[in-house]
Each structure stands twice: as C-alpha cells, then as structure tokens.
UniProtKB/Swiss-Prot annotation:
Principal localisation: membrane
Reactions the enzyme catalyzes: L-arabinose(out) + ATP + H2O = L-arabinose(in) + ADP + phosphate + H(+)
Binding-site positions, ATP: 46-53
Protein name (Swiss-Prot/TrEMBL): Arabinose import ATP-binding protein AraG
Free-text function comment from the UniProt entry: Part of the ABC transporter complex AraFGH involved in arabinose import. Responsible for energy coupling to the transport system.
GO molecular function: ABC-type L-arabinose transporter activity; ATP binding; ATP hydrolysis activity
Organism: Pseudomonas savastanoi pv. phaseolicola (strain 1448A / Race 6)
Amino acid sequence: MQQAIEQTSINGALRFNGIGKVFPGVKALSDISFEARPGSVHALMGENGAGKSTLLKILGGSYQPNSGTLQIGEQSYQFKSTAESIAAGVAVIHQELHLVPEMTVAENLLLGHMPNRFGLINRGAMYRRAGELLKGLADEIDPRTRLGDLSLGQRQLVEIAKAMSRNAHVIAFDEPTSSLSAREIDRLMAIIVRLRDEGRVILYVSHRMEEIFRVCDAVTVFKDGRFVKTFEQMADLDHDRLVTCMVGRDIQNIYNYRPRQHQGPSLRVTGLLGPGLHEPVSFAVEKGEVLGFFGLVGAGRTELFRLLSGLTRSTAGTLQLDGKPLTLKSPRDSIEAGILLCPEDRKKEGIVPLSSVAENINIGARPRHVNLGCLIQGRWERDNARSQIKSMNVKTPSPEQQIMFLSGGNQQKAILGRWLSMPMKVLLLDEPTRGIDVGAKSEIYEIIHNLAADGIAVIVVSSDLMEVMGISDRILVMSEGAITGELNRDEADESRLLQLALPRTRS
C-alpha cells in the first residue's frame, strides 16, 4: 500500500536501513545502512561505480530500492516517486541540474506552485516571492532573467533556492563543483555551511579531496555497492587513509610517472589564431612526450583543442605533423591525420548515451573497415569491443550495456578504447579525469604513460595543478587566450604555475 506523505518539518537524522538495488545483471547496492545527523555535512565517498549516485537517486525517488527503507526522524519511507521524496522534505541537487533553461528564474523556482489570481498567473506576486527566495543566497540574480542566460554556478544557486522554497530538511549534492570556477566554489561552500548551521542534513558527493576536508563533518565510504566504513570525525582521517579505504589498496604514486626518451618531432603549431585565442599560439610536442596545458577557466585551452581537432576553423597560423604541412577543415581531417580528441564534456561530446559500450567503442573505427562485408565487419566489431574493454579495464556487465549507465571513469576509458582502435599520432585529452575517482584516475594516468611509451604525443589540458605537474614532461601555461609561460617538469611548482595563469593587466 502506498503510504501517505505530507510536507514535513522533521528535524531528525536521515537513516538508510538495509538498502539494496539490483539492475539487470548488476547488483548496484547491497545492504547499505548508515546514519547522517542533522547539523552536519556527511560525505559519500567511493570509486566510480561504488553506488553513491544510485543511493542519491533512491533518496530522491528516481529509483525504488529492491530492499530496505529510508528513515527521516521517526518516519520510515519507501519513495515511489520524486514527488513523494520532495513532500518528505528531501532535495537532491544532481550534477545535471533539473531546471528549464527557456523559462525565467522565477518560473523555475515556483514551477507547479505559481501564485494565481482569477485563474491567471500573478506575475507580480511570482517575482516578489522569487526575490524573497533568492535573498541572501543570490541577490544579484534578477527573477525575470531567462535561466539559460545564467552561469552554471548561478543556475546551481537557483536549484538550491528551489530546494529552500520546499522547506527541504535533507539536501543532497551530487558532484556540485565539477564545472564551477574557484570563486563559485567558495560561494557554494559558504552556502553549504549556512545550511548545515540551520540544522539540516547535508549529503555531499565529490571526488575532490580538498572539498571533503574543507566542508564535511563525517564520511561514509562505499566500494562495489557495499558499505565499507563511516568516519564520524574528520580528525580521524587523512588523505592517504581515505584513498586506501576507497580503493581497497595503498596508492603510493597515483601519477605513475616514469622518464621516457622522446622520439623526434610530432606536431608543430606556429602562429595559430582562431575563436578564443587572443594572441598567436606557437608550440611543438614530440613523439613520446606528455605535454601539459595549465590555466584557469577561460584561459583558451579548450578553444585551442577545438582548433587542433578541426571542430573550429583557424583564422591564421600553420600546423605541421611529422614535418609535413597539415590543414584541418573538419574533425574528419583531424581523425584521418591521427589527431584524436577526448573532449572535456564526455557526456555531451564524447559518448552516444543510448548506444551500447561496444557501439561507442567502434564509432571511430568503422570507416577503416567498411569494405569487410557485413559478417566479417560484425565479428571484427565484437572482437574489437571486447579487446578494448579488457585492455582498458572498462567495468561493464556486458559490451551491450548502454554506456550511459557506466560511471564517468569507465565512460572515459571506453572513449580511450575507441581511439586505440584507430591509427593515432597525437592524443588530445581535455580534463581527462574530471569527475573521476582516485582509482580510475590512476588507471587513466597509466594509459597515458603507456601511450607515450609507444611513441604517441599526448597533450593534456588539466585544471588540477597536482595532476598536470604529476604526469607531464613539460607544461605550457595559458591565460586569456595566450601562452604565458613554459616550464620543464623539474622546474614547475604550484606558485610559478599560478603566477603564469593569473590574468595579466592589459595596456
């Protein structure tokens, strides 16, 4: 029987009691039990695929558990829908925000609860109410603004204000800072502390260790869909202990760096200009070299990669590959030349979500085998997919599993497997480990170093200072669409890189 759920102002703890969830061929969660206290920020940690997001979807009513119950205060629940979860005082703020870009901020905030008069929406009252909800949270946002015109950080604040409008006692954040600037992250941290101090239960999922130690009061660790341990006091934890608990092994050197012999010139860029580049860009990378690009948001690194992969057209400059002139008019030109891109936004640009893992791996490889005949082509694709899944250690119940159900780390490894099916000379990796857990990061770093050892020129864009210093042979720094410095591995440190990355005063 479906239980009646009413709007609650319960101020009790959130308890998960024996939660289990099974998908076809996969046991996503097994007997999860722990408690998150009011007035605390409780982190959920674990490798990709550990079950954190599945648990939040059960909390939010998107998934129904096969076993177990939720408890808020003294009331037990088994949510059958998101509406039931919301009515119980729960708000889940997902990585992909559930807002309508074409509507105004006010319409998004009050969707389903708009004030009306004589059967018509009372827009004056709607804007006033929206302004009240934004006050102290995002005072600079005009409720009349179209939501799609806001920055991602501002949209996230609107999502939080929406949760507040429903008097949410339990608020869960799923990777909330993955695409935010440093200033937006600072603002979000302050808001989370404020929500905690108001006595709410805050669940926080992030792969960024510095955020966990900055804002969280307790940590629960998951592995392979199972509860591992809850640390009730952050004083009991340090970075190494938490990583070991998450991955089940001690990772001494996550970056796996080892010196390599470079094998001669690969790609040379001279005087390149195009959208997002404000000064001519020139650099060269050698075969077997890992070249890092560091910079702050808006530095022009992603725009440079779009030019090098043929996604946008240059307005000036020349390219040489293996000493020969190269002209890129389209992504096909780049792929045929052996310059392959793993994009920053893998969900939108890197994968076909509704297609299988095998189909995603074989997308790039098909043009080389169109004349094999249907039977041989099909056999080759099956064998290639299985081979890449094995070599990349992609965790999937089957090659036919839709790739959208894989963790971020496994999606990234599948994309790398796609390019390994093709002739490759230069690999462009744009934020390759964003939103990926420590264990999967270590695997991707190992793949990068193995490719370099095979003579591939690997160019990595990363906003993670430790990462770019840890894996690169040489680092170029960009700021405001220009290269501002070059450092060899042994001379790079955080201070020098940040100084080069800061915007310059233009005359």
